[in-house]
Every structure is written in structure tokens, then in C-alpha cells.
Amino acid sequence: KSLPEAPLWDGKMRGILDKYKENNTPQLIIILGQEAWASYISQEYKPDIPVLCGMISKNAILLPDSDLNVAEWEPKYIDIQEYVDKGLHLGGFLYSYDVKENIRLIRKLYPQTQNIALITDNTYGGLAMQTLVKKEMENIKDLNLILLDGRKNNIYTIVEQIKNLPDQTVILIGTWRVDVNDGYYVGN
């Protein structure tokens, strides 16, 4: 799903959790995917039962309010370990993206690199990835971060931006499925 639909996810998750309160409380919640995970952690009420996750990232962001312009939204980075430390019973498989190690490899292969261009799409996963990379790049003063952001661009403007990148630039591809116009690009 595209990021502009994110405010709807919160209400859907709230409805599911409310449906299974009291006598209907499950013994385990299974969450698959970034969007479902974001919907769950964005809830004020989270039942005190174990959660099993799949296809989610260790890095996350909370969902925006419904009246927010997602193209301009600058969310705060959240490490899922913080939730575990606060007592959330969490298990499963988390993707962990090591931005520092990617930068180290880039510097080893291309020591003259001056710019990192990050491509992200108009999805929750794309914005969560962008938030993580921006956080990690705050500590890397000698490289410039260039954002090729699918929340603000379609595939054609991204291609033009790639053509016009400065010399000594390496591209990191975060994710690309959905552009600003909700155009899907899968398997091409």
C-alpha cells in the first residue's frame, strides 16, 4: 500500500484489537509486514500478549495523523528494541539494515565518494528506510546525502534526478514499488 493510506491503517488495527478484547483475547498476535507492524506499534492500547512478527524491519516509524501531508513528513526513527526493553513480548524475524557497514563498503570500493544518493519509494518501508539512513548519516560529516524520494517524485523524475547526480556519487537503493502517483513498479 502507498503511504498516503497510512492514516487508515491505524483505525483498521484499532478495530481488530477492540474486537478481540475481554473474553475474545487471543494468546498470540501474528503480524506480517511493515504496514501491519506500524499500525500495531502506533496504537495507544497494546494487549499484554506475545507478538510474533515477520517481514518487518528493526527500524520503524509511528504512523502519522490523518491530516498530515506525508510528502513533507519527517518522522522520528524508532528502534524496535526499545519496545522489547519496555516489556513487549516480541518474537519473529526482523530485518536489520546496517547502514554503517554499507558506507564502509562504499568507501572501500569507491574511496573518492562524496555523495550518497538514497532511492526510496512512497511506502511505509521506503520512509522508514529513509529515516534510518538520515539518522545514521548525521554522524558521517564528510558525505552528502541526496534523497531521491518517491513521496515527491514519479519514476520518470527519479530517472532524471539519477541522470543529473554529481560525480563521485554512489546510489543506495532502499526500496522502489510505488511512486508519488501510486504507480506500482514490480518485476520490471
State each model region's role.
Residues 1-188:
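Short hydrophobic alpha-helices and adjacent helix-cap/hinge residues
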